[in-house]
A protein has these predicted regions:
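Short glycine-rich, low-complexity segments
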Residues: 1-62, 66-168
Length: 168
């Protein structure tokens, strides 16, 4: 083997090694990026798509994703709109493998479930609250506390017990 062939062979081996290292780095970066993707970002990529959400109460809601917040998702079916608190979602079918930033706006990032409950209270809408226990409470939200809601039926419900809110 002459020197030219040896150098060419070494160069080819170096290129192959560099290619493998770039591929490994790209795979590591992709895994690292996925590690930081939350369920709300995956749901944001599903806006206007159908999903089926299995709730902690044992029920499933199927419908179109209309909006997503940091800890909630708005799903509409043919008849109603449901705000589902993500902390009580067990699984989701139809979820995109893609992810999307909910919003770059600090204001939108601030719109968590508590913010949403305050807005629902201000609207004085009649709602049905699905609780973790499976119970349904139908009333208007009269007051929103730090961790609870006072309802028009003189019942107080802990926010941590709410699985979904459906406008009636």
């Amino acid at each position: 083997m002459d020197w030219q062939d040896l150098l060419a062979e070494l160069e080819a081996e170096a290129e192959a090694l560099a290619d493998r290292q770039r591929e490994a780095l790209a795979a590591d970066l992709a895994r690292d990026e996925r590690r930081h993707v939350g369920i709300s970002q995956r749901l944001a990529a599903c806006i206007a798509s159908a999903v089926s959400v299995q709730l902690a109460s044992g029920e499933a809601l199927t419908g179109q994703v209309d909006a997503v917040g940091s800890d909630w998702v708005l799903i509409s079916d043919h008849h109603r709109e449901h705000v589902v608190l993500l902390s009580h979602v067990h699984s989701i079918k139809g979820l995109s493998a893609q992810a999307k930033v909910i919003s770059t706006s600090r204001i939108v990032a601030f719109m968590n479930a508590h913010w949403l409950l305050v807005r629902i209270c201000q609207q004085r809408s009649q709602v049905s609250l699905r609780l973790v226990s499976g119970e349904l409470c139908t009333a208007r939200i009269e007051k929103v506390g730090a961790d609870h809601l006072d309802l028009s039926n003189h019942q107080t419900v802990l926010v941590s017990a709410i699985v979904a809110i459906t406008r009636i």
